Amino acid sequence: MPLNVTVEEETLQIVEEEPQQEITNTILEEDFNLLDNSFQTDISSTSSQNDSKFTCLLVRHAESEHNVRGIRAGARIDSELTVHGYNQAKKLAKSIRNLDIVCVYSSPQKRAKRTAEEITKVANCPLYISDFLMEKDLGSLEGTSFRYTANYRPREPPMKVTNLESRDSLLTRARGFTDILFNEAIGFEGESGKTIVVVSHGIFLPFLLRAILARARTPLPSMIIPWNNASYCLITIDLGGNSIVKMNCNSHLRGIKRTRKLGSSTYDSKQKPITEFCSKLN
């Protein structure tokens, strides 16, 4: 069932920031303090019993049709992958195939789920869907163009944004999924090297990263680098309290070229690769 989210109403007097914009350290520290003070579970109490380490990959979905068109797609728009996005997802899956992936969690939205499905095919592991991982509800901004707000001028009437999901709601969802993640990790029973993959969205992922690091009692990086499509943040979490974070891992995407004309079109699972067609001719 859809989650109940807190919404807020805003009036934009300035150009709204795009989701991929870098986030300053000041904002990150403020959010980290909010999260850290709110957690009641201290995992250091379990460190003497469990010295396990596990890896968590926080993946942003591959390129979607709305990414290409420059259209805002939050929780209300269920955007599909493009053909290029599908190729990105396959390359991503191939690049992490040697990890010991226990399971994949995904947002129910198509762009995330399709990306997650490619990973599960390679990893041969279960896929779990969680509404906690959905993108931010953009309210009345859903379906609007980035180009429109980029051309917005203060002398024009203020743009009133309604039903925008609040930061508190995003933090609550991030905490909720963090509980699921750490409960899964506790089940590793002293094993190390296990990996959990989480596929979500560009606006929500920084909130999830903060929640996870707060739970792990690990300082935030000096800056959270925005996720590119089909890139991931790698977190090696030591249940004893230390974690290592690598941001925006995307070397696996090198060499992928957008297919002319078709690359930006919506991916259709019924379509067959041209290589398969050519093989039948031989």
UniProtKB/Swiss-Prot annotation:
Protein's UniProt keywords contain Nucleus: yes
GO molecular function: phosphatase activity
Cellular compartment(s): Nucleus
Active site: H61, E135
Pfam families the UniProt entry points to: His_Phos_1
Enzyme nomenclature, EC number: 3.1.3.-
SUPFAM superfamilies, per database record: Phosphoglycerate mutase-like
Residues flagged as site, Transition state stabilizer: H201
Major location category of this protein: nucleus
Domain of life of the source: Eukaryota
Listed name of the protein: Probable phosphatase C1620.13
Lineage, opening ranks: Eukaryota, Fungi, Dikarya, Ascomycota, Taphrinomycotina
